[in-house]
C-alpha cells in the first residue's frame, strides 16, 4: 500500500511539473498516465484528474485574484455556463463507453497540441478594438489591465457574449467528461469569440477552473467514481509539482 501511495504521489508530482511547464494544468497528463501505464479504469482516472485540477486551481486562486489581468465580472458570468456544462458532462461520463472517452481524449490532445503551436508562433496579444454588445454593455463586462511588457494600460471591450457562452458550455462539458481544466476552450471563447486580449483571457480562464472543477467533483463523488486512495496522493503530488514547475 505504501509503495502504491508513493508511486501515485510521484505521478502527481510529474503531472504537476509538466502541466506547469506547458501551461496545460496537471489534469491533461494524469488521465493518460493512469490508464495507459497503470491500467486504471478511465472513469476513475477522470475522477482523480478532476480533483487534481481542483487542487491546483484552489492553490492558485489567491494569486489569480491579485492579478489585475483577471476580469472577475466576466469570470462570474461565464461560470454560469461552464458549471451547467460540467453537470451535463459529468452525467454523460456515466453512460459514455470507455472507448469513446479514449477517442475524445485523443482528439483533445491533438487540439491542445495545435493550440500550443499557435501560441508559440503568435506572440502578439489581441488588443481588441471591438465594441461591447448589448449584454456586455448592460453587465459592464469590459475591462483594463496594465501590461508590464508593453509598459502601458490595455483597455478592452467584449463582443459576441452569446457565442462565448455557448463555447463556455462546451468547455464545461469537456472538463467534466475528460477530467481536465479545458483552459484551451475557455481561452478560445474569450480571446477568439469575445475578442478579449489573450493575457486577460488566460488569467480569467485559470481562475475559472476551480469553480468548474468543483461542480464536476461533486457529481463524480456522488456516483462513486472518486477513489480516495487513488485521488489523495495524486492531488497532493500535483499541488507540489505545480509549485516546482
What are these language model-derived features?
Residues 12-23, 60, 168-179:
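Transmembrane alpha-helix interface/packing and boundary motifs in multi-pass membrane proteins
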Residues 1-15, 36, 66-172, 192, ...:
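Juxtamembrane transmembrane-helix boundary motif
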Residues 51-59, 81-85, 92, 208-215:
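Membrane-embedded alpha-helical segments of transport systems
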Residues 30-44, 185-200:
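Interfacial segments of multi-pass membrane proteins
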Residues 22-30, 179-187:
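Transmembrane helix boundary and interhelical junction motifs in multipass membrane proteins
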Amino acid at each position: 500500500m505504501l509503495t502504491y501511495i508513493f508511486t501515485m504521489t510521484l505521478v502527481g508530482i510529474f503531472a504537476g511539473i509538466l502541466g506547469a511547464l506547458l501551461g496545460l494544468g496537471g489534469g491533461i497528463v494524469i488521465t493518460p498516465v493512469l490508464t495507459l501505464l497503470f491500467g486504471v479504469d478511465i472513469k476513475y482516472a477522470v475522477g482523480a484528474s478532476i480533483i487534481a485540477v481542483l487542487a491546483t486551481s484552489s492553490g492558485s486562486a489567491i494569486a489569480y485574484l491579485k492579478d489585475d489581468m483577471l476580469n472577475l465580472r466576466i469570470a462570474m458570468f461565464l461560470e454560469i455556463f461552464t458549471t451547467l456544462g460540467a453537470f451535463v458532462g459529468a452525467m454523460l461520463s456515466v453512460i459514455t463507453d470507455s472507448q469513446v472517452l479514449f477517442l475524445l481524449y485523443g482528439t483533445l490532445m491533438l487540439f491542445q497540441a495545435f493550440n500550443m503551436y499557435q501560441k508559440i508562433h503568435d506572440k502578439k496579444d489581441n488588443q481588441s478594438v471591438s465594441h461591447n454588445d448589448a449584454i456586455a454593455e448592460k453587465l459592464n463586462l469590459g475591462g483594463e489591465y496594465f501590461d508590464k511588457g508593453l509598459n502601458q494600460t490595455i483597455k478592452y471591450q467584449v463582443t459576441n457574449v452569446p457565442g462565448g457562452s455557448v463555447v463556455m458550455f462546451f468547455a464545461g462539458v469537456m472538463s467534466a467528461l475528460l477530467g481536465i481544466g479545458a483552459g484551451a476552450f475557455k481561452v478560445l471563447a474569450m480571446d477568439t469569440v469575445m475578442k478579449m486580449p489573450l493575457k486577460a483571457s488566460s488569467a480569467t480562464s485559470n481562475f475559472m477552473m476551480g469553480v468548474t472543477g468543483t461542480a464536476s467533483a461533486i457529481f463524480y463523488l456522488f456516483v462513486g467514481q472518486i477513489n480516495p486512495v487513488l485521488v489523495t496522493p495524486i492531488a497532493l503530488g500535483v499541488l507540489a509539482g505545480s509549485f516546482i514547475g
